[in-house]
A protein has these predicted regions:
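Small-residue-enriched alpha-helical segments and adjacent helix-cap loops
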Residues: 13-141
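Short, conserved aromatic-histidine micro-motifs
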Residues: 109-111, 145-158, 216-219, 223-224
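A glycine-rich phosphate-binding loop feature that marks nucleotide/adenosyl-phosphate handling sites
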Residues: 120-125, 194-202
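Flexible, glycine/charged-enriched surface loops at secondary-structure junctions
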Residues: 39-45, 112-116, 184-198, 217-225
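N-terminal charge/polar-biased segments
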Residues: 1-3, 201-227
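Intrinsically disordered, low-complexity polar/charged tails and linkers
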Residues: 1-11, 22
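Mobile "lid/hinge" segments at catalytic clefts and subdomain interfaces of large enzymes
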Residues: 122, 131-191, 205
Length: 227
């Protein structure tokens, strides 16, 4: 449900656009669907394009015409993985788009205790507001910095640094470790930052780093067995 005005309901739909990168054909398709059904287009803060003002009877038809997946599958899930231009920017320190797309594929629609946002950026300038997200992955010359618990909602919170100077693989598995720990230990409805505050950052960081070391050791053993 998008809007109720004078007793009439209109709806909005938001197709999946990984990292905010979209092909010209898909962008034209979204515009054509909005035009066909009299909708308005809105560039969202989550790096997607929403079609707003649709009539109830047109929602399903609009999705069929788009032929795209929805941007959000559940209210309590990983909402999106935002990315900066990175490889198209002179300031980028790593190929963070490659890592970001890998994270997006892994966590698209993944269920969480509360809505969760992840951002992957190519340098410390953090053009996609990484430090206002639940999990932030920031590239530097020496590797990736991982922070957790950021928020820009009703209770703004800066994230806590968890690890730094990780390789691409290590950064991916660190995000996975944070996600798993959050899902296993947090209360339903609890934002990641609130969870960290409840158990303390010292415990959160210690537990996550221990789990991460175990995960990496297991991965090394599996790789050795497959050689």
């Amino acid at each position: 449900l998008q809007k109720i005005r004078n007793g009439k309901k209109t709806y909005g739909i938001t197709p999946r656009i990984p990292g905010g990168f979209i092909t010209p054909d898909n962008l034209i398709k979204i515009a054509n669907v909005a035009k066909k059904y009299g909708g308005a287009l809105k560039l969202t803060s989550g790096q997607r394009v929403a079609i707003l003002g649709l009539q109830p009877e047109d929602v399903e038809k609009a999705w069929e015409d788009l032929g795209m997946e929805p941007g959000v599958l559940s209210s309590y899930s990983v909402k999106n993985v935002e990315m900066c231009p990175a490889i198209f920017c002179k300031r980028s320190k790593q190929n963070s788009v490659k890592l970001g797309m890998r994270i997006e594929r892994r966590f698209y629609g993944a269920i969480t205790p509360n809505r969760t946002k992840i951002t992957v950026v190519g340098c410390r300038n953090s053009c996609s507001s990484a430090y206002a997200k639940d999990i932030s992955v920031v590239a530097d010359q020496e590797g990736y910095i991982i922070a957790a618990g950021g928020s820009a909602g009703f209770h703004p919170r800066l994230p806590d640094k968890i690890a730094e100077y990780l390789t691409e693989d290590e950064a991916f598995y660190m995000v996975e470790t944070i996600y798993d720990y959050y899902c296993n230990e947090a209360e339903k409805g609890e934002k990641l930052g609130h969870f960290i505050d409840r158990i303390t950052i010292d415990k959160f960081r210690k537990d996550v780093l221990n789990l991460f070391e175990e995960k990496m050791e297991n991965i090394k053993k599996e790789d050795a067995q497959n050689e």
